[in-house]
From Swiss-Prot:
InterPro entries named among the record's database cross-references: BRCT_dom, BRCT_dom_sf, DNA_ligase, DNA_ligase_AS, DNA_ligase_CS, DNAligase_adenylation, DNAligase_N, Hlx-hairpin-Hlx_DNA-bd_motif
Signal peptide residue numbers: none
Keywords, sorted A to Z: DNA damage, DNA repair, DNA replication, Ligase, Magnesium, Manganese, Metal-binding, NAD, Zinc
EC number(s) stated in the UniProt entry for this protein: 6.5.1.2
GO molecular function: DNA binding; DNA ligase (NAD+) activity; metal ion binding
BRCT domain segment(s): 577-656
Nucleotide-binding recorded as keyword: no
One GO term of the biological process aspect: DNA repair
NCBIfam families documented for this protein: dnlj, PRK07956.1
Name this polypeptide is given: DNA ligase
Name of the coding gene: ligA
Cofactors that this protein relies on: Mg(2+); Mn(2+)
Length: 656
């Protein structure tokens, strides 16, 4: 229970961290049930204290902000999140609010699949783009990969503009086969089918996506110009276009019918082809939907009725510590194997050491294990009556299990702060090279992985010592590609200070905080906790994280700063951006250009532009090369400004 505004602000920061791990890193720290409980407490506090509500509260936004390496793409109509209900009384209260005003309302119920939400845009019957949910307003453009999902039609009979939305999932059977393949290849296993679906959809190599046997199950539409009267009619229309039908779909008139269908799904969930975590309930009549409208985050005409967790008893026989992508240490219990919902469970997350202490969980305890939402196994509580004296306290580690570095222990999480820790080094370098950091073109995760395998790099400093002959050893590297990467690495020297600070990947310090820190000069990271706390927007966790990070990596940071020679200010860059005709404009590139489109896209983004893959009424400029195709006609229809490559180069030159 949240008791003060300070606790409220801490809860927002904590939930946003969890959301980032879940949506962007595919690396959930806690189970769905724990997140839901924390979220509901936050929501209850805000209902009692509406004047305290913050814009960055998870109740005010959907999902998480999209991250690299995929381009951002806006949805034509927002993708909303659903409010959850957890029991009969909550469902009854939700239904009564609707039926009191609209007694004739009916409800469409369907299984809630636990996958990755995807928005497909069709125009003139062709698949134009596929975009993940992201923050609800824009997501990641994954069109090339989505086209390898067998049951996504590349063409449909309807010729108007329409967004078709659904869930990308992997079946239980295919998930088990995939993990078996990875086990045989000594590759890390996917924690659950949702992670497998997300990771497969976001592959840089579309051939990998093609092999993963993903499926797309539609559940609704976004923008369209059709005149449906009911939600059921809309779903039937989607199926008529060649999409897969939703199993166990039902139309219900009252609470009793909904409960009957809910319990039918619970009985059938074990034999269902994919993992489920509840039932979606949507008002069928579209005129009633329109009148009910939306909250800041969710539609008032739909909800997700969550399933109860599946639980069994077993024994903790050991504990290991895993190092996540951000350096977070997650204790994992080794269990006597127990079957839950058809899966043999021999491990379960303990989340963090604060959770272990709070629940008084001990080694050799008999415990209650649940699979919350059919995904991450979790230990809910110890069965203290079974204790026989053989139990021992689970000690919080003091050093990293991988690199033996001293750990940073916060109130809830424990982190490895060592940038050279092998468990987090690869992800740190991917972040180091990313668009919001040093923006090194061509240095993606596959290249970094090869560099590690060939023992050519250990940390970011090694990137700047690479030679042409080093890169020529890598798969698919020829002289031109190798030289381009070397040039891009050298070009990243002398960056704006905020970019280098952000590239370090310091816990709790993102792009905005890095820009604030850069205002204090090149020696800013040497400041004390008290000095950091005086900076606008900096709290205790951020200040401590900075101090501990610098203390652990002083030598590395000094060497990196000396080598890269960051600029104390990028005022010229900001001035150029603000005076640019492209600043805050949405731009689409099409056709064959003399340079790669990505190169032009990067130039325009540096000038404040937003790059999109599809033309709409919101597009400001269309940049056309040879064989521009249908996008040119669409731009002319919407009155979009069209520039050829020569005109674009002229405008770019004027800004130099």
């Amino acid at each position: 229970m949240i008791k003060s505004q300070k606790e409220y602000l801490e809860r927002i920061a904590y939930l946003n961290t969890l959301s980032h791990h879940y949506y962007n890193l595919d690396d959930p720290i806690v189970s769905d049930a724990v997140y839901d409980e924390l979220y509901q407490e936050l929501k209850a506090y805000e209902e009692k204290n509406p004047s305290h509500i913050q814009a960055n509260s998870p109740t005010q936004k959907v999902g998480a902000t999209a991250t690299n390496p995929f381009n951002k793409n806006p949805h034509l109509m927002r993708m909303w999140s659903l409010d959850d209900v957890f029991n009969q009384s909550e469902l009854q209260a939700w239904l009564q609010r609707i039926l009191k005003a609209y007694p004739s309302a009916s409800f469409v119920c369907s299984p809630k699949l636990d996958g990755v939400s995807l928005n497909l845009l069709y125009h003139h019957g062709k698949l134009i783009s596929a975009t993940t949910r992201g923050n609800g307003l824009e997501g990641e453009l994954v069109s090339a990969n989505a086209k390898h999902i067998a049951n996504i039609p590349h063409a449909i009979a309807y010729k108007g503009e329409i967004e078709i939305r659904g869930e990308v999932i992997i079946s239980k059977k295919d998930f088990d086969a995939l993990n078996k393949e990875r086990l045989n290849a000594n590759e890390p296993l996917f924690a659950n089918p949702r992670n497998a679906a997300s990771g497969s959809l976001r592959q840089l190599d579309s051939e990998i996506t093609k092999k993963r046997k993903l499926q797309f199950i539609p559940w609704g539409v976004g923008k369209h110009s059709l005149n449906f009267l009911s939600f059921k009619e809309c779903l039937d229309f989607i199926v008529s276009l060649g999409f897969s039908a939703i199993q166990y779909l039902s139309l219900n008139k009252n609470h009793q019918e909904i409960e009957e269908n809910y319990h039918t799904l619970i009985r059938e969930r074990e034999g269902f082809f994919a993992l489920l975590d509840g039932m979606v309930i949507v008002v069928n009549e579209l005129n009633i939907q329109k009148e009910l409208g939306y909250t800041q985050k969710s539609p008032k005409f739909a909800c997700a009725y969550k399933f109860p967790a599946l639980e069994k008893h077993t024994k903790i026989i050991g504990v290991i510590n895993q190092v996540g992508r951000s350096g977070a240490i997650t204790p994992v219990a080794l269990l006597e194997p127990v079957e839950i919902a058809g899966a043999m469970i021999n491990r379960a997350t303990l989340h963090n050491y604060s959770e272990i202490e709070k629940k008084n969980i001990m080694l050799n305890d008999r415990v209650v294990v649940i699979r919350s939402g059919d995904v991450i196994p979790k230990i809910i509580k110890p069965l203290e009556s079974y204790r026989d004296g053989s139990q021992h306290k689970i000690e919080r580690p003091k050093v990293c299990p991988i690199c033996s570095y001293e750990l940073l222990c916060e109130e809830i999480f424990t982190y490895c702060q060592n940038l050279n820790c092998p468990a987090r080094l690869k992800e740190s370098l991917i972040h180091f090279a990313s668009k919001d950091a040093l923006n090194i073109q061509g240095l993606g995760d596959k290249v970094i992985e090869q560099l590690f395998e060939e023992k050519l790099i250990v940390n970011a400093l090694d990137l700047y010592a690479l030679k042409l002959e080093d890169l020529m050893r890598l798969d698919k590297f020829k002289i031109k590609k190798a030289q381009n990467l070397l040039d891009a690495i050298q070009k990243s020297k002398n960056p704006p200070l905020w970019r280098l600070i952000n590239a370090l990947g310091i816990e709790h310090i993102g792009k905005g905080a890095s820009k604030t820190l850069a205002k204090y000069g090149l020696n800013v990271l040497e400041k004390s906790e008290a000095e950091f706390l005086e900076m606008e927007g900096f709290g205790v966790e951020m200040a401590r994280s900075l101090v501990n990070f610098y203390a652990s990596n002083q030598e590395f940071i000094r060497s990196l700063f000396e080598l890269l020679n960051p600029r104390n200010s990028d005022m010229a860059e900001e001035k150029q951006k603000s005076s640019s005709v492209f600043n805050n404009k949405t731009i689409v590139l099409t056709g064959t250009l003399s340079k790669p489109r990505q190169e032009y896209a990067q130039m325009l983004e540096n000038l404040g532009a937003k790059i999109s893959s599809s033309v709409s009424a919101k597009t400001n400029f269309l940049i056309v090369g040879e064989n521009a195709g249908s996008k040119l006609a669409l731009a002319q229809k919407h009155g979009v400004s069209v520039l050829n490559e020569e005109e674009l180069l002229k405008r770019l030159k004027e800004l130099d």
